Amino acid sequence: MASETFYKVGDGEEAMLKKETLNVLNALDQMSKPFPNPKSMNRTVTTKSLPLSSRGSLVNFLEEDAINLPKHMPLEDSECSSDDTSISPMSSTLLNPIKLAVTQPNSRFFAGMLEGELNKLSLSSIAKSTEKGHLALCPQSKSQMAPGGLLDFDNPEVDTDTSSTPSESSVVLDVPEAPFVCEHTVSDSTAVISWTYAPGKQQVSFYQVLLQEVVRKNSGETPKAKNRPWIFNKILGTTVKLMELKPNTSYCLTVRAANTAGVGTWCKPYKFATVATDLNSFPENNPIQITVQRKEPQRKTVSLGLEDMRRLEDLEHLFPY
């Protein structure tokens, strides 16, 4: 109504009032429209998933609301962007964790250390160590702990204030039993001897082999060993190869095992003989080899009680010989 009234007036002063009134109305019209909240608008733009509009339809949002979206604001001004990868401050103790290493000695370790010093072992030291049981130490008081969380072995209370727990690392008490020679392969100058040792028995650190040459004076006399034997020490395996033997010669061999407790007994003498050399019958590049195998005899023990003995007596009366 105001604009139509001013158009009817035609003098110069009223034209000036018309222009100023239009400017005021335009300013009021701009202030009447709600100003969009940049942060609330930014929530729609920065979200990766496509949201529905306030009108309740995805189609309406695409057709009607797309033109009303404001320009994309920088992510640094947004408070709820899904691309936010900020990391909360971490504690200094997590950046520099304390690393602990726990080790326990085992029997193989001690066997390797004491392998070459069996003669220096004393029975008193072994008996004293066995009273403590196993080698796992459990500190019970703070006085035994050195700075840094390590066990103080210089503290005399460690020997008295420790508890033994089941462990695989135990002190060896008994010497190993005698091995059994099970196989040998001979030629005219070499011999490969193998022996067995029952698993589950005393632990073995190494073996010792003694070899002697047997000489026959007459056919009716028993063989006699020479006074100069060969001794092979610290054999880790259960097979040995003897080189540079005399052809067509008899030898006598015996083996024993050793561990940290000492050396065991020698096995029964094992006799073998090398093959005779006959260059006319067999070529030199194809020598003869003979292999002999044997099994350890099995012993079975039968125990009978009083009732079993009475049953046997009754059977004797019923079925006499």
Swiss-Prot record:
Xref: PROSITE patterns: FN3
Xref: InterPro entries: FN3_dom, FN3_sf, Ig-like_fold
SMART domains: FN3
SUPFAM superfamilies: Fibronectin type III (SSF49265)
Gene3D superfamilies registered for this protein in UniProt: Immunoglobulins
CDD domains: FN3
Fibronectin type-III domain segment(s): 175-277
Recorded superkingdom: Eukaryota
Pfam families: fn3 (PF00041)
PANTHER family: FIBRONECTIN TYPE III DOMAIN-CONTAINING PROTEIN 8
Official protein name in the record: Fibronectin type III domain-containing protein 8
Organism in which the protein naturally occurs: Bos taurus
Recorded name of the encoding gene: FNDC8
